[in-house]
Curated annotation (Swiss-Prot):
It catalyses: Selective cleavage of Arg-|-Gly bonds in fibrinogen to form fibrin and release fibrinopeptides A and B. It comes from the Eukaryota. Its main location: secreted. Expressed by the liver and secreted in plasma. Residues 19-36 form the Peptidase S1 domain. Keywords: Blood coagulation, Calcium, Gamma-carboxyglutamic acid, Glycoprotein, Hemostasis, Hydrolase, Protease, Secreted, Serine protease. It comes from Salmo salar. The gamma-carboxyglutamyl residues, which bind calcium ions, result from the carboxylation of glutamyl residues by a microsomal enzyme, the vitamin K-dependent carboxylase. The modified residues are necessary for the calcium-dependent interaction with a negatively charged phospholipid surface, which is essential for the conversion of prothrombin to thrombin. Belongs to the peptidase S1 family. This is Thrombin.
């Protein structure tokens, strides 16, 4: 999912939901910050 999220930067909300389902939100915070 990380690869898809990085490719689709505009899908931040959808990407966040996917991460929450697959991985803890805390873990998702790091990649999200790097993307921004």
């Amino acid at each position: 999912s990380f690869g898809s999220g990085e490719l689709v930067x505009g899908e931040x909300p959808x990407f966040e939901k996917i991460i929450v389902k697959g991985i803890d939100a805390e873990v998702a915070s790091a990649p999200m910050q790097v993307m921004l």
